[in-house]
Regions:
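Glycine/Thr-rich phosphate-binding loops of Rossmann-like dinucleotide-binding domains
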Residues: 14, 37, 92-93, 231
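Donor/substrate-binding cores of folate-linked one-carbon enzymes
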Residues: 22, 81-200
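N-terminal glycine-/serine-/threonine-rich beta1-alpha1-beta2 phosphate-ribose binding loop
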Residues: 36-80
Length: 232
């Protein structure tokens, strides 16, 4: 299967690694532009870019996907599927319609719960005892597409949010490979999301983004500063 991959942070790395290991043809990788970090404010590449370059995969870092030239370039790849994992940008309709089999997203929650940019962090904030990942076809709304597969996992009593993050990114990679296999076989039945059950997981405020990855997740039962962070 020929795949165009879109992803940026650590959460997306295992998914790209799994696609490479499974023998899929990765025709290109789209990721966010390099950003200044550290005391010297030197430009640092996203983790997905570093992985792609190690495997000699072409990398593209447009500011957005709205430009006609960028959209024509994406269409010209002729990918069977566009896989999106924590890319950080919405895909316009011209991009969503480009691949033969659609755009498949790996999301770090059991949709329709926790749509948005920080599903794992809000899982921890709310003291949930169960977490998971969902694969879905992408639509124009924020995480509103039809669901394909889910994988659920309990949150361990002594598990830190850092450990949960790492488990879910690996679980997402496994679920992605299973999803693509079944998609290629025509063995998937997309399931629309129940809008009445949808909840949202927006980016965290500064007050809620204090980093402490050493505390057990289940210590937390209500929204307050706790063991959470944005994408690492």
């Amino acid at each position: 299967m020929t795949i165009l991959f879109m992803g940026t942070p650590d959460f997306a790395v295992p998914s790209l690694e799994a696609l490479i290991a499974a023998g899929h043809t990765i025709c290109g990788v789209f990721t966010q532009p390099d950003k200044p970090k550290g005391r010297g404010h030197k430009l640092q590449p996203p983790p997905v870019k570093e992985l792609a370059l190690r495997h000699n995969i072409p990398v593209f870092q447009p500011v957005n996907l709205r430009g006609e030239d960028t959209q024509r370039e994406i269409q010209a790849w002729g990918a069977d599927v566009i896989v999106v994992v924590a890319y950080g940008k919405l895909l316009p309709k011209a991009v969503l319609d480009a691949p033969r089999l659609g755009c498949v997203n790996v999301h770090g929650s059991l949709l329709p719960k926790y749509r948005g940019a920080a599903p794992i962090q809000w899982t921890v904030l709310n003291g949930d005892k169960t977490a998971g990942v969902t694969t879905m076809f992408m639509a124009e709304g924020m995480d509103t597409g039809d669901m394909l597969l889910k994988a659920e996992t309990p949150v361990g009593e002594e598990e830190t949010s850092g450990q949960l993050f790492d488990r879910l990114k690996d679980l997402g990679a496994q679920l992605l490979i299973e999803t693509l296999e079944k998609l290629e076989q025509g063995a998937l039945t997309p399931i629309p999301q129940e809008e009445a059950q949808a909840t949202h997981a927006p980016m965290l405020s500064k007050e809620l983004s204090l980093v402490d990855w050493t505390k057990p997740c289940l210590l937390y039962t209500s929204p307050s500063p706790r063991d959470i962070s944005g994408s690492r």
